[in-house]
């Protein structure tokens, strides 16, 4: 009785493609405090998330108080994964290139300086400040060049990011 070799085939999991999610995606004014609007731009291996933050009484998102910019680079889509919402998507790794805050009016700037926001008291209106590695009230922010892991799914009209559990709409 001889041993027969069994033919085996290895099937690799599908891998995501950056070209599928390239472009501009946005999330309109949130319905809960803090009121925010977000825009995601994905081009090449770069992913930029810009958040405009509004006042507690500005539910229409009329006048932004400050902006937060997170720029990730070296985007690498990975294999297919099950996301927290039980849909299928893909893993995504990147490195943090920029994490900054910009106060957009004098009142916000004064408040940030009085409260030593992110440990800083030299905020200036419309001037961007790096806040990577600093504590801005929710624990220490990631440091520059730190690896970031997320998962995503998409349709032709929307992009879902698993880490934030937010869905962004495709912009023309």
Residue ranges and their predicted role:
Residues 164-172:
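Short, low-complexity, Pro/Ser/Thr/Gly-rich segments in the mature regions of secreted, periplasmic
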Residues 21, 39-48, 149-159:
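Short, solvent-exposed coil/turn segments at beta-strand boundaries
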Residues 1-5:
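N-terminal Sec signal peptide cleavage junction
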Residues 28-35, 52-156:
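Contiguous, well-ordered beta-strand patches that form the walls/edges
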Residues 6-9, 88:
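Intrinsically disordered, low-complexity regions of eukaryotic proteins
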Residues 50, 162-163:
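Beta-strand residues in well-ordered beta-sheet regions across diverse protein folds
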Residues 10-38, 168-169:
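Tryptophan-anchored aromatic micro-motifs
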């Amino acid at each position: 009785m001889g041993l027969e070799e069994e033919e085996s085939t290895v099937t690799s999991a599908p891998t995501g493609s950056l070209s599928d999610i390239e472009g501009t995606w946005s999330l309109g004014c949130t319905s809960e405090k803090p009121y925010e609007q977000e825009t995601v731009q994905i081009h090449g291996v770069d992913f930029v998330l810009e958040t405009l933050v509004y006042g507690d009484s500005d539910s229409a998102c009329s006048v932004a108080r400050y902006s937060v910019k997170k720029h990730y680079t070296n985007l690498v889509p990975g294999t297919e994964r099950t996301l927290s919402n039980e849909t299928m998507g893909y893993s995504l790794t990147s490195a943090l290139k920029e994490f900054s805050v910009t106060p957009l009016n004098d009142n916000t700037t004064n408040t940030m300086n009085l409260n030593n926001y992110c440990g800083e008291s030299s905020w200036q209106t419309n001037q961007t400040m790096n806040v990577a590695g600093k504590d801005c009230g929710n624990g220490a922010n990631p440091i520059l060049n730190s690896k970031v892991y997320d998962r995503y799914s998409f349709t032709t009209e929307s992009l879902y990011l698993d880490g934030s559990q937010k869905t962004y709409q495709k912009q023309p």
